[in-house]
Amino acid sequence: MTDHTKEHENTPSMGFLDGLVNSISQQPKAIEEEIKFDGALPVLPLRNTVLFPDVIVPIGVARQRSIALLESLAPNSPVVFLMQTDADIDAPTPDELHKNGSVGLVLRTLRMPDNSMSVIVQGVKRVVVEAFTQTEPYLAAKVTPKDEEELEGVEFDAYARTTKQLASKIIELSPNSPNEASYAIQSIENTRFLIHFIASNISVPAAEKQKMIEAEGMKARAERLIHFLNREVQVLELSKQIQTKVKTDMDRSQREFILRQQLKTIQQELGEQDAQMQDVEKLREAVEKKNLPEEVTSVVSKEIDKLSRIPQASPDYSVTRNYVDTILALPWGHFSETVINLHEAEKILNQDHYGLGKVKDRILEYLAVLKLKSNMKAPILCFCGPPGVGKTSLGRSIARALGRKFIRISLGGVRDEAEIRGHRRTYIGSMPGRIIQGIKTAGTSNPVFMLDEIDKIGADFRGNPSSALLEVLDPAQNNAFSDHYLEIPYDLSKVMFIATANTLDPIPVPLRDRMEIINLSGYTEYEKLHIAERYLIPRQLEEHGIRPEDVSFDALTTKKIINAYTREAGVRNLERQIANVCRVIAKDIVIRRESDQPDETPITVVTADLKKYLGMEQFYPDVSEPVMLSGVAVGLAWTPVGGDILFIESTVMKGTGRLILTGQLGDVMKESAQAALSYLKSCADYFKIPDEAFRYWDVHVHVPQGAIPKDGPSAGVTILTSLASIYTQRKVKPCIAMTGEITLRGRILPVGGIKEKVLAAKRAGITEILLPEKNEKDVKEALETNGGAFSDVSFKYFHEMDDLIDYVLEPAENGAPQFKVEDKDHTPETTGNESE
C-alpha cells in the first residue's frame, strides 16, 4: 500500500515554526456545547498521532472507513480519537487500538485532489473506552470521560514556569524558529493548555506521547513533559557545540589554505619558489589526496612543516623526507577486494596441491565465515611439517584462492628484534621492520603474509624477535601494531598471517599459543606418485623445454625413483631426481635432432633406464632385514624431516652391574634406559632373570649412527625390549618395529608423530608395528586418509609392557639364561653373547 493511503501525522515539531505563532497566542475558548457521553461515539483510528485536549491539529485521512465516518458527521460533532498499537495496520480492530485517547470536535474538513481528506480537529477531553459497540461501517464505542483536577497553587505555577523556560530555550537553540514563538509561549496563562500544547508539538516518539495522555493527573503529565524538554535542550546544546567546533576547524583550515595559496602566488610572481618548496607542496597535496587516519594526518603534517624549515643540505632533511615518503607509501585503509566463491577457491587449492584435506577444509571454513561476516579478524595459522610437503607453496595458493596479494619473509637466522619492529629514527640508516616493509610492498592492508621458518628464529644481545612477534600474531593487539620507525599504530588485524615450521619445539610457548597449529604429515608412496604425475613431471618438462608428447614416465619407473633414489617425507628431492632425468633426456633429444637422420620417436622412461639417468640405487627397501642376534630391537623415530627407523643394540659383559649408554643420546633417552633397566630388575622373577645378571654383569646399550644426536621418550619401549632380549637370551621377532614411552610401573604411554613413523616403517620393509593402546586413534585417522598406503602393514596395540615383551620375543633356544659366578672375585660367564 502506498503512502497516500495512510493517515499522515501533520503535527509540527518543537521548532514552533511560522504558521504556529498565531495558534499559540490564541488560547482555545471553552467549548460551549456539552458533549453527551451517555451514548456511543464514533471512533477515528490514528497512526503515530496523539490528540491532546484543548489542542487544534490538522490530520490527513485516507482510509475509506475513516472517510465514511467524517462524511456522516454533522458540523462540530464529537469523535473519539485513538492511536493504533501498530501503525502499519490498515484496518485496525478494537483490540489493535489503545483504550485511552481524547474526544474532540471536527472543526473543518477539506477534500484533497487524491480523494483523501484533511481535517482540523480540536481536542476536548481525555476519555477511556469502556466497550466498542460497532465495527461497520466505522468503529463506535462507549467511552467514559476522565476528570481533571484544578491547577492551583505554587507547585503548578513552578511547573508552568519551568515548562515555559525550557520551551523558550528550545526555540532559542532551534534554527529557523521565529522569535515571536517565544513571546507567544510566555503569554499563555492556562497551565493545562500550555502542557497539552507543548506535549502535542514536542519531537518525541508517539508511544511516549501515548504514555503521557494515559498518565493520571496533570502533575504526572507535567513531570514527564519536563523530562522530555530537558532532553531536547541537551541534544540541541550538544549539536550547537559540535557545529561550532566544526565551523571553527573549517574556518582555520580555509584560512590556512587561503594564506598558502597567496604565499604560493607571491612566490611565483617573484620567482622565489625553489625546488624544496615545490617538494613540500607536492607532499602536502599527496596528504590531501590520501585518505589517512586523523592521527596519521596530524603527524605527517607536522613532519612536512618541519621539512619546509630544514635546509636540503642538512642530514635531517633526508631522514624526515624518507619518513614522510614511507608513511605516504603505506596502504592506509586500502584493502584488496575479496571475491569469495567457495567452489572456485576449492578448485584452485586442488589444482595446486594434492591431498592436505585438513588444511583445505580450514581455509574453506574461513572463507565461508568471511562471506557471512565481512569484518571478521583473519586467522593466525601455523603449518608445521617436514621439508618439502608444500607449506610455502600452499600459502601462495591460499592467496590466489582469496584473490589477495602474497608476501613472504624468511625468519630463518633472524636474531635482531629490530628486523621485526624496525629501527628508531635516531639511528643512521633506520628503516621500518620487515612487517611494515612487507605491507608497503603489497600495497594493500589485507595481504596473505607468510612468516617462513618461524622455528629458526634466533636470539642474542640485540633482543629476541620471537617476543616482537607476540604483538604481530595476537588478534587482540595487532589492530594497533607499533613499529619503532613509524611510531604510529598500524592496523594488521585484516592481514592473514601464515607461519611455517618444521618442528614446534623451538617456538616459545606464548608465541605458539597465539597460532592455530595445522600439522602437515609426510606423503605416502601413493601420494608421492600422484604428486609426481600431476605436478612435478609436467613442471620439470616445461622448465627443460621438453614437450609432453615427447616424453612419458611409466608409473613403475616413478615408484622406483621414489623408493630407490629418494628417502624423504616431502617431494623436494623427488623433483630434483626428475629434473636430473629431464636434463639427460633433453640432451638426448637435442643430439637426435642434430643428427643426419633426426628421430622424433617419443621417449618412454622405464625402470631399466634409471641407472643410465640417475646412476646406482641410493636406498634399498630391505634396510630392516631380520637380525639373528638377541639384544637387537627396531624402534621408530620422528625427525623434523619425517620418520625414520632406529636400531637399539644391547650386549652384556663381565662387570659390576653398570649401565653403559652410547650413541650420542639425550637426557630424556638416557632416563628412558634407566627406567627400562629398573623395570626389568623389578620384574626379574617374571622374566626368569637371575639376580646375578644385574649384580655381576655390565650391560651396554648402543644406538647406531653415533654422529647423529638422538633424544625423546618414544624409544623407551624399544630399549626395554632390547634389554629384555639380551637378559633372557630371546630374539626379537623379525620385521617388527615399535614405539612408545614407558613408566616404572610397566605402562606404555602414547607418543606423537605416528603417521611419519608408520611411513618410515613401511619404507624399511616393516610388516608389523607395535604401538601404545592410546595411539590407536592416530592410526585410524591415518588409515582414513591413506588407507591404501598401509594395506601391507599390521598394527598391534599394548597397554602393559610385559604383554608386549611376551608377544615380541621368541622362545629361548637353550632354556633359561645362565649367569654364573665361578670364583670369589665374581668373574661371571654366560652362555649368551658377550658382544655383537
UniProtKB/Swiss-Prot annotation:
This protein's UniProt keywords: ATP-binding, Cytoplasm, Hydrolase, Nucleotide-binding, Protease, Serine protease, Stress response
Occurrences of domain Lon proteolytic (ranges): 627-811
Domain Lon N-terminal, first and last residues per copy: 41-233
Conditions for induction: By heat shock.
Localization terms from the record: Cytoplasm
A Pfam short name: LON_substr_bdg
Molecular-function annotations in GO: ATP binding; ATP hydrolysis activity; ATP-dependent peptidase activity; sequence-specific DNA binding; serine-type endopeptidase activity
Family matches, as SUPFAM superfamilies: P-loop containing nucleoside triphosphate hydrolases, PUA domain-like, Ribosomal protein S5 domain 2-like
Binding-site residues, ATP: G385, P386, P387, G388, V389, G390, K391, T392
Catalysed reactions, semicolon-separated: Hydrolysis of proteins in presence of ATP
Tree of life domain: Bacteria
Active site: S714, K757
Region Disordered, residue ranges: 816-836
Summary of the function given for this chain in its UniProt record: ATP-dependent serine protease that mediates the selective degradation of mutant and abnormal proteins as well as certain short-lived regulatory proteins. Required for cellular homeostasis and for survival from DNA damage and developmental changes induced by stress. Degrades polypeptides processively to yield small peptide fragments that are 5 to 10 amino acids long. Binds to DNA in a double-stranded, site-specific manner.
Assembly notes: Homohexamer. Organized in a ring with a central cavity.
Protein family: Belongs to the peptidase S16 family.
Protein name: Lon protease
Lineage of the species this protein comes from: Bacteria, Pseudomonadati, Chlorobiota, Chlorobiia, Chlorobiales
